[in-house]
Every structure is written in C-alpha cells, then in structure tokens.
Curated annotation (Swiss-Prot):
Keywords: Antiport, Chloroplast, Hydrogen ion transport, Ion transport, Membrane, Plastid, Plastid inner membrane, Potassium, Potassium transport, Transmembrane, Transmembrane helix, Transport
Family: Belongs to the CemA family.
Coiled-coil residue spans: none
Superkingdom of origin organism: Eukaryota
Catalysis performed (reactions): K(+)(in) + H(+)(out) = K(+)(out) + H(+)(in)
Functional note: Contributes to K(+)/H(+) antiport activity by supporting proton efflux to control proton extrusion and homeostasis in chloroplasts in a light-dependent manner to modulate photosynthesis. Prevents excessive induction of non-photochemical quenching (NPQ) under continuous-light conditions. Indirectly promotes efficient inorganic carbon uptake into chloroplasts.
Protein name: Potassium/proton antiporter CemA
Annotated GO CC locations: chloroplast inner membrane
Compartment list: Plastid, Chloroplast inner membrane
Pfam families assigned: CemA
Membrane topology: Multi-pass membrane protein
Protein source organism: Oltmannsiellopsis viridis
InterPro entries assigned to the protein according to its UniProt record, in alphabetical order: CemA
Length: 352
C-alpha cells in the first residue's frame, strides 16, 4: 500500500505558475547536496521503472480486453441470436428507408446496364420505351399470339428461384406487400426457351433471369447489412460497458498512465511538440478536415444502420470542428502556455 501511494505521489504533479522543469532541476540540485543522495536516486529510479511497467500494463489492458470482448461477443452469441430473431420474426429486410433507396438505385443502374447489353447483343430493332424493356410473347389460354410487344419490369419484384430455367413471380415490393399496376403473373424464362410451347397462359419475358437474380442478390445483401448493423450496435455497447468497468477498476493505474503520457509529451523538444500540435490541429480542424469528418460520420451511420441525412451531416461538420478548435486553443492558452512557454512560441512561429 505504501509503495502504491509513493508511486501515485510520484505520478501526480500539480501545475503551478513556474514551469515544472525549473522546479524539478532546483529540487534535484538540492538533493545532491545531502549525503543520502545515492539512496534517493536509487529509489527514484525504482519508482520510475514501476511507473513505466504499470503504464504499459494498464494501456495493454485497456486495449486488449475490450477488443477481445467485442470479438468474442460478436462471433459467439450476438451474431447467431440476432440473425435468428431477425430472420424469424422480422418481415422487412430493410432497416431504414435509406437502405431501401440504395437498393432501388442499384437496381435501376443494373437495369440500365442490362438494357444496354441487350441493345448491343440483339439483332432486333431497338425498342425505345421508358423503363427496362423486354421482348415477350403474349399467349392466350391454349393458343399462341405471334405479335410481339414490350413492357417494363420494375425493381419491386421478389423472385422465386425454384427452377433455374423458369421461375414464376408476382410484382411485389421488397417489404412483401403487393404493389404496382400489374397484377398478372410473370414467368421468366431462359432466352433459349422463347418461342417454344413450354409456356401457356402466361407471359414469356426474354432475358429476365439476370434481373431476377439481381433482385435476389439485393434482398440477401440488404438482409445481411441489417443483421450486421444490429450486431455492431450491441457489440459496441457491450464493449463500451466493459471499458467503463475497466476505468472504474483501474482508477489508480489510469492516473499513473496519464502522468506517464504527459511526462513523455513534455520531455520532447519544443520543435517536436509544436509539430505534433500543428499536425493534430490541421488534421482535426484544418482546411481539408470537413471531408474527413463527413467520411467518419458516414462510416458511423453505416456501421449502426442509421439513415443518412445530409442536413445532419452538414450541421455536424459545420459546428463540431469549430468547437474542437476552440477547446484546443483554450488548452494551449490556459495550460501549455504556463507549462512550456517556449513550445507555444515555437508553435506560433511555425504557424506564421
């Protein structure tokens, strides 16, 4: 208990009006005048070594244990449980409207690419019709009409891939509700089967299998994204809770770690400290920092499955860097100017 209290006393050093480097130099000079200076230096070396070991141990504990808890919880029980509950009790595959809009945009792009490929590869005359046209044959019950026509296929169809050659689907929204103007049933066929008598009483659509497979891929991808977002949310909350517990349990070690990091920073020369300050401020609140904050906020929203609102992102980018810049300037004026005035002078000289 006594050694720990001595270690804490050596780790915590109050900030005064006179720089600590001057006070430390005067104290060491006075201590060298006494006959027991050798024992004091040995004791000081032991305290310094213990401070380094405790700081490294505390730092590794704060890094390794939360990462291990996050990986173990996410892999072992969070992912299987959330996947089971989501696939069993949830009817929607989309977590929010932004995710649905992304899927629809990707589907429209795929329709345009598929339409372009059909125009390039087809020997028929190009058909100009709004949406993605497919050439199909209309059949009546028991008879075949040789007239060809076209009709667009929307991105709200949900496929039934039971047969690799023909698959029957109905126009539906991805949420599961029937929508659209078409209420008839579609039977998608392979282009090699068009014109044969294997389809009666239905509409045979040419080259619709790629579109059908793309719908299935988008639905599966959106479902996986929703499960991953919920898993990340609960795993990060559990990691944050474990980190709070570690901060409470390792309070004395964290004080030693904080003092060790501060002493390490102050032991650097003025040029190095000024360079680190300039690099940090330019990275966080510099001219090019808004784009970085946008990417960071976009990553956070995507990780937790939150909708992307441009107004919120722009408001955050416009206010948070300004607040952070004010805090950094206050810290430089209030604390660093008293502890190391030469560093502040070098910092302003490098900025100018």
């Amino acid at each position: 208990m006594d050694s720990e209290s001595q270690l804490l006393e050596g780790a915590v050093e109050k900030i005064g009006l006179i720089p600590r480097s001057i006070i430390r130099t005067i104290n060491r000079f006075q201590q060298q005048l006494f006959p027991d200076a050798v024992e004091y230096f040995i004791q000081e070396f032991r305290v310094s070594r213990s401070q380094v070991l405790v700081s490294l141990q505390c730092l590794l504990t704060l890094i390794i244990i939360p990462l291990f808890i996050h990986f173990f919880a996410k892999t072992v029980f969070l992912t299987p449980c959330i996947e089971y509950v989501w696939n069993t009790y949830k009817t929607d595959i989309f977590l929010n409207s932004y995710q649905q809009e992304q899927a629809l945009t990707e589907m429209r792009n795929f329709e345009e690419i598929l339409y372009f490929d059909l125009l390039v590869q087809s020997n028929e005359e190009p058909v100009t019709q709004e949406g993605l046209p497919f050439t199909f044959l209309q059949h009546s019950q028991g008879s075949v009409d040789e007239e060809k026509t076209t009709a667009p296929i929307t991105a709200y169809a949900v496929s039934n891939m039971g047969n690799p050659e023909t698959a029957t689907i109905a126009p539906q929204h991805l949420h599961g509700s029937v929508g659209g103007k078409l209420e008839s049933e579609f039977r998608f066929t392979n282009p090699s089967f068009v014109g044969k008598n294997n389809v009666t009483g239905a509409t045979t659509i040419t080259a619709a299998i790629p579109l059908q497979k793309k719908l299935v891929d988008l639905a599966q991808s959106a479902n996986k994204q929703s499960i991953a977002a919920l898993t990340n949310l609960f795993a990060d909350l559990l990691t944050l809770f474990s980190l709070i517990i570690l901060f409470i349990r390792l309070k004395s070690q964290i004080i030693i770690l904080k003092s060790f990091l501060i002493e390490t920073f102050y032991s650097l020369n003025d040029t190095t400290k000024s360079f680190m300050l300039i690099f940090s401020t330019d990275l966080l609140v510099g001219f090019h920092s808004p784009r970085g904050w946008e990417i960071f906020l976009d990553f956070i929203l995507s990780r937790f499955g939150l909708p992307h609102d441009e107004n919120i992102i722009l408001l955050f980018v416009a206010t948070f860097p300004v607040l952070l810049d004010s805090v950094i300037k206050y810290w430089i004026f209030r604390y660093l100017n008293k502890i190391s005035p030469s560093t502040v002078a070098t910092y302003h000289a490098m900025i100018e």
